[in-house]
Amino acid sequence: MLPMSDTRSSRIKPMTLNFGPQHPAAHGVMRLILEMSGEVIERIDPHIGLLHRGTEKLIEYKTYLQALPYFDRLDYVSPMSQEHAYSLCVEKLLQCVVPPRAKYIRVIFCELTRVLNHLLNVSSQALDTGATTPLLWMFEERERLLSFYERASGARFHAAYIRPGGIAADVPDGLLDDIHAFTESFPKLLDDVDGLLTENSIWKQRNVDIGVVSKAQALDWGFSGPMLRACGIPWDLRKSQPYEIYETLDFKVPVGSNGDCYDRYLVRMAEMRESISIIRQCLNGIPEGPVKTDDRKIAPPRREELKYSMEALIHHFKLFSEGYKVPEGEAYVAVEAPKGEFGVYIVSDGTNRPYRCRIRAPGFAHLQAIDAMARGHMLADLTAIIGSLDIVFGEIDR
């Protein structure tokens, strides 16, 4: 037996620990290889690819309309934001003009999607740190939002509602009134969650000064969305590079100051309030009119036309069997998705299928910083850090 003073025994070898992919706080199929010194994290090596489906390659074999549903299945917590980015990119290549009513409905549903995403993130982050009540309250409101999705598109998650040229169909009667009623009652829930968490001493101990990221680090890592704004950088694509009707809307960009888990929570809570304000403005200003472009080479004709017009029937058949040809060229469009900058880059060779489609997922940039964020923290802090990252592996692995 070696004496305790022996140099060989005084060097503690780091313990290697597997975190996930079957772990309730892993938020999907995340696998982390942790190097631990006791309870302190010395290094993290994230392993990705367990949900890789080859989405970018699959898109090359589909027409532009058939490729749309793949985007619902990337970040499956906020599907319409990704449909929106893809549709805007295709419209940029087609130089297609979308009717004003369709733009308003797109923005309404994109902001509902932001609320949908942040409700899940805040409630699951709270659950990961031991608070169960917010999950029960917030999931009740998520159900209401998913019912709006279902009434508009027929599906709770994979909506395929925002399409190149406009939207799939106008909203059913009474839906906009119900969304307005939701905007009236929803702030009460935010006030209740605020009262439960924001000044709660246990919540603050678990999140303040945990996973701190400086402004310079956030820019170096390629952060965007709430992760970037929590560091104090007021970068929001809806303000800096406005698309659709955002330049006509009045809203603030919430920012943090410390760049820690607590600030990321505060930013997301404030963003939900701003989204409600945006939805109200859209509901008050939404015009009447068509919801699809009148170019029948891009959007299908109205169903009534199919009963008496042979030309409409031919357009409908050609559109859904062959699709439309997109002019040769390339385009990149990014939208302010709930998790950050979601970008779509399409190269067209003039056929009815994309030659190349590159997807820029915000969660990919955020996950790569987990080693720097968690180093030196306790193992118990890792769940708070992962919760504040707001990652979904559908978009990271693609």
From Swiss-Prot:
4Fe-4S keyword on record: no
Swiss-Prot/TrEMBL catalytic activity: a quinone + NADH + 5 H(+)(in) = a quinol + NAD(+) + 4 H(+)(out)
GO cellular component, one term: plasma membrane
One Pfam entry name: Complex1_49kDa
Residues in the signal sequence: none
Protein's membrane topology: Peripheral membrane protein
Enzyme class: translocase
Location(s) in or outside the cell: Cell inner membrane
One annotated GO molecular function: NAD binding
EC number: 7.1.1.-
Keyword tags: Cell inner membrane, Cell membrane, Membrane, NAD, Quinone, Translocase, Transport, Ubiquinone
Family to which this protein belongs: Belongs to the complex I 49 kDa subunit family.
Quaternary structure and interacting proteins, as annotated: NDH-1 is composed of 14 different subunits. Subunits NuoB, C, D, E, F, and G constitute the peripheral sector of the complex.
Function of the protein: NDH-1 shuttles electrons from NADH, via FMN and iron-sulfur (Fe-S) centers, to quinones in the respiratory chain. The immediate electron acceptor for the enzyme in this species is believed to be ubiquinone. Couples the redox reaction to proton translocation (for every two electrons transferred, four hydrogen ions are translocated across the cytoplasmic membrane), and thus conserves the redox energy in a proton gradient.
Protein name, as recorded: NADH-quinone oxidoreductase subunit D
Species of origin: Anaplasma marginale (strain St. Maries)
